[in-house]
Amino acid sequence: MHLTKQRGRQTEVKLGGLQKLTLLDYPGLVACTVFTVGCNMRCPFCHNALLVSKIEEENALDEGGFFAFLKKRQGILDGVCITGGEPTLQQDLPEFIAKIKALGFKVKLDTNGSFPDRIKSILETGNVDYVAMDIKNTLAKYPETVGIPGFDTSKIERSIKIIKESGIPYEFRTTAVSPLHEADDFEEIAKLIEGSQGYFIQGFKDSGELIRGEGLGELPEEELKRARDKARIIIPQTKIRGED
């Protein structure tokens, strides 16, 4: 893994992959998406399962190579999406983001909201232009949905508050998975993020590399629409990802 010398110490962000072009991940911008390695959650439906636990060193993305790529894309790409895994697990994420910003790119940060203090610190740097937080389920269903018995949902509530009050454009989103979600859950989820700028419901897609995919599937289209309509009771601008 490439190490960069900064402020008298070495910094390292573990990268697992790069999507060189996306027109979808960063709303309104032409961007690339970089994937960090490691996650504290074990959501059975995670479509990036290889990034959650470990990735073979020879398959990792070299940080130096990533920044060389960005320099070649200056004036072509508008932004960089940082996703995972869970990016806020990376100790040196603030420095990593600052280096991206120094090249003139806008930065979108994806997070599961597990580390509110880290999120607050990163957002306060002013280097993040857009943040997207996954709301996994209702608070009561969080432990089962993230694969961690006794998961502390107060951290999720704190992160929601921090993001809403940050002054930075943001969105909340939920991947709808059967049987973990039912349409009626989405009104309760919407109450959790009431007053938010935007809420997206995403249909589950089996990537073939799930953590534990047995018995999981998509919500039927009509059930997905009912979930959207339930959420719209609280957040009128709720959309299913991809719909007009």
Task: Label each residue range with its predicted role.
Residues V13-Q19, G38, L51-V52, G65:
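SEC14/CRAL-TRIO lipid-binding/transfer domains and related phosphoinositide-recognition modules
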Residues G28-L61:
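Canonical Radical SAM [4Fe-4S] cluster-binding loop centered on the CxxxCxxC motif
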Residues L50, G84, I135, G203, ...:
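Residues that line or immediately flank small-molecule/substrate-binding pockets and catalytic motifs
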Residues A49-V80:
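Conserved alpha-helical substructure of the radical SAM core
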Residues F67-G79, T88-E221:
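Conserved AdoMet/S-adenosylmethionine-binding subsite of the radical SAM
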Residues H2-G28, E165, S178-D244:
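Auxiliary Fe-S-binding modules of radical SAM enzymes
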Residues F35, T83-G84, T111:
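A secondary-structure boundary/capping signal
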